[in-house]
């Protein structure tokens, strides 16, 4: 190893140690978000998950404009009503958000349950998809179906404001897109985020 490589290695080691110390001193918090009895649409809906962690002094609030996730869980539940139908859930992170909620057609190429991802935004690496799954319900047998998805990777989420509004979204904001094959069924979404308050 050359002297230059040794210095770079030492710098990385020191930076890693400092990061570890800062994270060990940060307060670990837990936030749960529930939206229930929503009617699915064939055009799709994007639900903001992370901007519900508002700035404040409470146990579930953040003190600044950044958190680091330790563990995220998404629970989904669908109920078929009138028709047997499919529900598609896309749980994702917006890597470059600047105070908006992404449109369905920014994530998908078209507002359709069978659509591929939007090639432009994904080529730009705007979104990171955690999970993309379909749940099928039947009004005869499987009236209610559910699924749990987990992300255990540590990820930074930044905020542009204190309140629970789209304008507060920053890079790393997390969302779930829900779209159905029929506009009759209902769904529930619960998100739990365990995070370090940075």
Curated annotation (Swiss-Prot):
Keywords: Capsid protein, Virion
InterPro entries reported in the protein's UniProt record: Satellite_CP-like, Satellite_virus_coat, Satellite_virus_coat_sf, Viral_coat
Signal peptide: none
Molecular function, one GO term: structural molecule activity
Protein localization: Virion
Identification of the protein by name: Coat protein
Entry GO CC: viral capsid
Domain of life: Viruses
CDD domains (alphabetical): STNV
């Amino acid at each position: 190893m050359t002297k230059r490589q040794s210095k770079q290695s030492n710098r990385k080691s020191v930076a890693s140690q400092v990061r570890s110390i800062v994270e060990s001193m940060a307060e670990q918090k837990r936030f749960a978000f529930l939206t229930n009895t929503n009617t699915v649409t064939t055009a799709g809906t994007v639900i903001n998950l992370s901007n519900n962690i508002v700035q404040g002094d409470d146990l579930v609030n953040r003190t600044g404009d950044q958190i680091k996730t330790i563990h995220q869980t998404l629970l989904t539940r669908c109920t078929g009503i009138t028709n047997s139908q499919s529900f598609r859930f896309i749980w994702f992170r917006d890597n470059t958000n600047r105070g908006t909620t992404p449109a369905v057609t920014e994530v998908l190429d078209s507002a359709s349950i069978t659509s591929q991802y939007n090639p432009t935004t994904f080529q730009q690496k705007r979104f990171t998809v955690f999970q993309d799954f379909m749940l099928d319900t039947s009004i005869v047998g499987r009236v209610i179906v559910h699924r749990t998805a987990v992300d255990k990777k540590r990820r930074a989420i930044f905020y542009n404001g204190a309140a629970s509004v789209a304008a507060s979204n920053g890079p790393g904001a997390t969302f779930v897109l829900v779209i159905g094959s029929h506009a009759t069924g209902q769904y529930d979404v619960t998100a739990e985020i365990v995070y370090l308050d940075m």
